[in-house]
Amino acid sequence: MEIIHETILEVDVNRLKSNFIYLKSKLKEKTKIIAVMKAYAYGHGDIILAKKLEEFGVHALWVADFEEGSRLREGGVQIPIIIANPGTKSTKKIIDNKLDVVIYNFKLLQLYGELNKEICVHIKFNTGMNRYGFNADEAKIIAKTLLKYPKLKLQSICSHLAA
């Protein structure tokens, strides 16, 4: 009979806090930390970990889609939650849960702008991964478009850096 061993990973919240404090100590005082919590924290208790990170002083959380963001918000997380792939069909849920969105093309920029609702946005540029993101030469057009939609609140410029 073959013995099957389970793989178990436990997150030590005290060490998580210690690591956060250490990393924060290496940054300039006003630097904000955004914790990536994609895939429901890979099964490690997304709501529990998100609340702990919020307690430690993380500025915002980054998740893959609106379902993850909505779950965290409904679980009581108050800090900004950034949706990496907001899509086009989840706008109501995103607005209702006050979720931030990453805008990586003109279709999304126009869609969220035309909703005429206050939405915090993060503009993503392609810096070599060639997956999602505006090209650098589109920056002026993006800026002009954002001015056209004053209810879109620019929070950051971001990218997924290529190794």
What function would you assign to each model-found segment?
Residues 20-31:
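Glycine-rich phosphate/diphosphate-binding loops that line cofactor/substrate pockets in enzymes
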Residues 3, 8-10, 15, 31-163:
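Active-site-proximal beta-alpha core segment in soluble small-molecule metabolic enzymes
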